[in-house]
Amino acid sequence: AILTFAQNFTIDDYEKEEVYIEMRDGAKLFTSVYTPKDKSQKYPVLIKRTPYSVKPYGADTMPQKLMHNTELVASGYIFVNQDMRGRWMSEGEFENTKPPYSWSDKKRTDEVTDSYDTFDWLKKNLKNFNGNIGQY
């Protein structure tokens, strides 16, 4: 049997990047990306989209912890936190509980299209991303 040992990542093992991800209608959503400093392997992404702020803001400002589940942090993920449309540092108009629109209307936006556009950007722009995304 082959034994593998997961690296135990802590907040000190991550670097932070802040980006604005452009949606299909041109609105830019503020996004904090926390990537493991170890670039020797590829990692899955866990993304949180929230109306309640992804602070702390500032590329050199790290949170006290990336998430409450320390086992996930220790396992090594790319963590992505995004201010939802129209909230905090993101552009656009916030609409609480907006119903999803039909995919046939390419100009209308909702939380589904914003998630899709974000996932697409991550897939195309993140280095060391293994292609797996989970949203929490």
Task: Identify the function of each model-found stretch.
Residues 127-136:
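Alpha/beta-hydrolase fold nucleophile elbow
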